[in-house]
Amino acid sequence: MILYEYPFNERIRTLLRLEDLFERFAFFLAQEDPREHHVALTTLFEIAEVTGRADLKSDLMKELERQRQTLAPFRGNPGIEQNALEAVLGEIEQTLANLAQMQGKTGQHLVDNEWLASIRSRAVIPGGTCKFDLPSYYAWQQWPAEQRRQDIAKWVLPMLPLRDAAAIVLRLARESGQASKVMAMQGSYQQMLSGRTYQLMQVRVAPELRVIPEASANKYMLWVRFTMQDGDVRPRAVDIDVPFHLTLCNL
């Protein structure tokens, strides 16, 4: 099944973007070629843009504290797996401590590094990081892969508490959902929400159907409309019945 996720609010939208960026960053950092490390570095700059939002850290701390207060009363409850509970609470408490230790504006260390700042300013220009534009960057790219990797890992280190916090919030949100099998009649599905607040919607569809869900929602109703991509033409709505799994997640 192919999984599509749709955020219901701006906070979850930001966390999903952050998750995607960190996954891309980790993939390219693990590679050996300097061109792949270039992608890791430019992705690091994107991460800095997202994490530089003034309220992101405080939002994550508030959400983690809320989750801690929700879960802590279950300690000693015989109906709850205590080892799993303690693992989650320990992870939350450690991440809260790491967030509290973060000083200043997130990503400021990249701004203060004049060499990285020069690369960052050129990276937004198409072809702007050629060897004749940034010979010092080209020289760095010729260093051994492990040395480049250590440098990039050092530069991302101050932002890792935000990655960990986002991962916990998204995991708890995803685990809160219960999947149900539904049918989009003639490619369209809608469901009343009865005023309930959700954080995230997941749509799982069989890959052989080759359909693409497009979703929207408000506090009263959600809509899922399936389309199909054919060649160079924009995705068009389908008029066939489409079975899929729908999960609504709410922290």
Curated annotation (Swiss-Prot):
Pfam families named among the record's database cross-references: ZapD
Gene designation per UniProt: zapD
Residues spanning the membrane: none
Keyword Cell cycle in annotation: yes
GO cellular component terms, semicolon-separated: cell division site; cytoplasm
InterPro entries the record matches: ZapD, ZapD_C, ZapD_sf
Subcellular location: Cytoplasm
PANTHER family tied to this protein: CELL DIVISION PROTEIN ZAPD (PTHR39455:SF1)
Subunit structure: Interacts with FtsZ.
Gene3D superfamilies: YacF-like (1.10.3900.10), YacF-like domains (2.60.440.10)
Family designation: Belongs to the ZapD family.
Keyword list, A-Z: Cell cycle, Cell division, Cytoplasm, Septation
Function: Cell division factor that enhances FtsZ-ring assembly. Directly interacts with FtsZ and promotes bundling of FtsZ protofilaments, with a reduction in FtsZ GTPase activity.
Top-rank lineage group of the source organism: Bacteria
Organism encoding this protein: Burkholderia cenocepacia (strain ATCC BAA-245 / DSM 16553 / LMG 16656 / NCTC 13227 / J2315 / CF5610)
A Gene Ontology BP annotation from the UniProt entry: division septum assembly
UniProt protein name: Cell division protein ZapD
